[in-house]
Amino acid sequence: IYGEKDGTLPYSENSYGFVDILNPRACYPSSKRAAETLCAAYKKEYGVDVVIIRPGHVYGPTMTDTDNRASSQFPRDVKAGKNIIMKSAGTQLRSYCYVLDCATAILTVLLNGESGEAYNVSNKNSVVTIREMAEAFAEVGGKKLIFEEATKAESASFNLMQNSSLTSEKIEALGWSAQFDMLSGARRTLNSMF
């Protein structure tokens, strides 16, 4: 929802960046913005009780076999006995949240959130680079992290946003706190996969 921004500060619930609507990837943040606008309109027009939840990058043992995000590929590779192969330096900063923490955050907002408000779901102890996430899965799974050159097609599919970290103060003020940092979330993910 937030789009691209300047600077290194994490996104708060009231900060928005630029979305290039001619970029094919723009459909994702644009559709999320449209959904939130509909929620706000229904609250104002019909008095519908609405809370908005904005999760960061949620990971855990719930990914599908076709999910090609790094947070799904890395644990699948480790579980299959493979080393983790990275096709970039992995310097992009992301707010990761273990799936169980995300579930408790959603319940907290549904029960305690203020109607009409939006809440980021972010674990301040798991704001890490993609490389650091890969290192956590490699460490827990006893595998190596290997870097290879990306093909032109692979490079074209990368999300180049350097910093998509989120603040968590607003949801923490409701009494929520994350229980799993990146290392414990990686361990729990690998231990729960079949």
Language-model features, listed with the residues they occupy:
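Catalytic helix-loop patch of NAD(P)-dependent Rossmann-fold dehydrogenases
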Residues: 1-53, 57, 66
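Amphipathic terminal alpha-helices
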Residues: 182-194
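A short C-terminal helix-loop "cap" of Rossmann-like NAD(P)-dependent dehydrogenase/epimerase domains
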Residues: 12-19, 74-86, 140-152
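C-terminal "lid/loop" region of Rossmann-like NAD(P)-dependent oxidoreductases
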Residues: 89, 116-119, 131-134, 142-163
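Hydrophobic alpha-helix immediately C-terminal to the catalytic Tyr-X-X-X-Lys motif of short-chain
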Residues: 34, 38, 42, 74, ...
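Glycine/proline-rich active-site loop of Rossmann-fold NAD(P)-dependent oxidoreductases
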Residues: 33, 59-73, 82, 87, ...
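Residue-level signal for the nucleotide or nucleotide-sugar donor/cofactor binding architecture
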Residues: 26, 30, 66-69, 94-100, ...
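Glycine-rich Rossmann NAD(P)(H)-binding loop
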Residues: 58-62, 86-96, 119-128, 154-160, ...
